[in-house]
């Protein structure tokens, strides 16, 4: 499919929208009342620190809602106001935050049902319905299906995600295989790969090193090459385009990324493949075999930079707040753990209690319960949150921490 031509056609359709409907002031006021926090603003104004009793909160200087998330939520709220009686669907969670998605459900925004085989059931969508595409975007196949149905589409895709789509389309035009640094099951990567031609999704630097080694050492004999190819295909069974052949499709590669991945790792992967093609084809041929554009999201970079700064503080523990399926939140937790700071990833204040107990998600593990997670005595606690987390959620958790440590330290009347 010529995805670029399809996007141009879709954007010209009267049924397609990616801007608001004139309800900005009303929606802005509503979002501020639902998601903002006077306490968090107070902490910002106080140099990102607040002490109550023997607890000092150190807040990251960049955290919480990014511009793309705020925009997506605002457009979803505007859509409901513009179409008060119509049936409204959304193809996925608008963002990875349970409270925001619950609010949309309360507004009678329905989620496209998922069948037992994992495929979405779009037969429920009627011609007169409205469908919201979330901040992560949607695959080009889903967009075409909805366009063909003739339903109204509100596209809240983050512009940074759209920028990555443009990059992989350039890879496709130049006959480069898109090496996508991301999680192959993540909604954003699914959407991005649908705009690519030939692609391979790599989770981390370790997988990238495996691929780089294959490029340089595919095997010396036919049997070795056959075995190495079979091992490669088994390792990346669910992470490549149909018909992908590592023997031919890794001769020309372009780098792209899921916007929420670790910035430093994406850069390392890009440099690794640049060095790899230089070794294989020579310095003069690098541009014939390697292509890279800067597709690292500013907001992701800012939040990662802020927690790198925060973990240099003498902290006793870190609280990382965000949806458990939020990629950018998970990476914030990784940074804290790499600094050997005890880290608790929670998605809401309801995970805390009763008493000095917390239900949290360790990195790459299931939910677990830890008792006495807040030690006695003075505590310096780092707090950050993913790009999909409202200030109000952070505020509730900070207040809960204060109340556990000392009843006299409860923050009264500041919200």
Curated annotation (Swiss-Prot):
Q: Which residues bind dimethylallyl diphosphate?
A: 96, 186, 326-328, 388
- Give the Enzyme Commission number: 1.17.7.4
Q: What InterPro entries does its record include?
A: LytB/IspH
Swiss-Prot/TrEMBL keywords: 4Fe-4S, Iron, Iron-sulfur, Isoprene biosynthesis, Metal-binding, Oxidoreductase
Required co-factor?
A: [4Fe-4S] cluster
Listed CDD domains:
lytB_ispH
Give me the residues that bind [4Fe-4S] cluster, please.
Answer: 66, 158, 297
Q: How is the cofactor bound?
A: Binds 1 [4Fe-4S] cluster per subunit.
Catalytic activity entry: isopentenyl diphosphate + 2 oxidized [2Fe-2S]-[ferredoxin] + H2O = (2E)-4-hydroxy-3-methylbut-2-enyl diphosphate + 2 reduced [2Fe-2S]-[ferredoxin] + 2 H(+); dimethylallyl diphosphate + 2 oxidized [2Fe-2S]-[ferredoxin] + H2O = (2E)-4-hydroxy-3-methylbut-2-enyl diphosphate + 2 reduced [2Fe-2S]-[ferredoxin] + 2 H(+)
List the pathway annotation.
Answer: Isoprenoid biosynthesis; dimethylallyl diphosphate biosynthesis; dimethylallyl diphosphate from (2E)-4-hydroxy-3-methylbutenyl diphosphate: step 1/1; Isoprenoid biosynthesis; isopentenyl diphosphate biosynthesis via DXP pathway; isopentenyl diphosphate from 1-deoxy-D-xylulose 5-phosphate: step 6/6
Q: Name one GO biological process term.
A: terpenoid biosynthetic process
Please tell me where isopentenyl diphosphate binds in this chain.
96, 186, 326-328, 388
**Record's HAMAP family?**
IspH
Q: This chain belongs to which protein, by name?
A: 4-hydroxy-3-methylbut-2-enyl diphosphate reductase
């Amino acid at each position: 499919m010529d995805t670029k031509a399809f996007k141009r056609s879709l954007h010209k359709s009267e049924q397609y929208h990616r801007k608001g409907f004139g309800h900005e002031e009303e929606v802005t006021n509503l979002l501020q009342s639902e998601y903002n926090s006077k306490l968090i603003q107070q902490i910002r104004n106080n140099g990102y620190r607040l002490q109550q009793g023997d607890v000092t909160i150190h807040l990251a200087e960049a955290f919480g809602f990014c511009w793309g998330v705020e925009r997506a939520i605002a457009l979803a709220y505007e859509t409901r106001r513009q179409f008060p009686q119509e049936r409204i669907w959304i193809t996925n969670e608008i963002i990875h935050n349970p409270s925001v998605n619950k609010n949309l459900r309360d507004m009678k925004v329905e989620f496209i049902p998922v069948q037992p085989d994992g495929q979405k059931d779009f037969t429920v969508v009627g011609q007169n319905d409205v469908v919201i595409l979330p901040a992560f975007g949607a695959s080009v196949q889903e967009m075409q299906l909805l366009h063909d149905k003739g339903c109204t589409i509100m596209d809240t895709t983050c512009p940074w995600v759209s920028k990555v789509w443009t990059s992989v389309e350039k890879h496709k035009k130049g006959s480069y295989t898109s090496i996508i640094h991301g999680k192959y099951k993540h909604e954003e990567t699914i959407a991005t790969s649908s705009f690519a031609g030939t692609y391979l999704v790599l989770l981390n630097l370790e997988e990238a090193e495996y691929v780089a080694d294959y490029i340089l050492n595919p095997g010396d004999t036919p049997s070795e090459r056959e075995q190495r190819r079979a091992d490669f295909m088994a390792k990346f069974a669910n992470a490549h385009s149909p018909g992908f052949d590592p023997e031919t499709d890794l001769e020309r590669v372009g780098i792209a990324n899921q916007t929420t991945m670790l910035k430093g790792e994406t850069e390392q992967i890009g440099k690794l493949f640049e060095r790899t093609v230089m070794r294989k084809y020579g310095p003069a041929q690098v541009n014939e075999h390697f292509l890279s554009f800067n597709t690292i999201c500013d907001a992701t970079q800012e939040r990662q930079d802020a927690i790198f700064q925060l973990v240099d503080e003498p902290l006793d523990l870190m609280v990382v707040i965000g949806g458990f399926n939020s990629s950018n939140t998970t990476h914030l937790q990784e940074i804290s753990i790499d600094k050997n700071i005890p880290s608790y990833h929670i998605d809401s204040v309801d995970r805390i209690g009763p008493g000095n107990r917390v239900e949290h998600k360790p990195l790459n593990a299931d939910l677990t319960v830890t008792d006495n997670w807040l030690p006695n005595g003075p505590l310096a606690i780092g707090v950050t949150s993913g790009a999909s987390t409202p200030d109000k959620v952070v505020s509730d958790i900070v207040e809960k921490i204060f109340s556990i440590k000392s009843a006299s330290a409860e923050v009264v009347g500041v919200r």
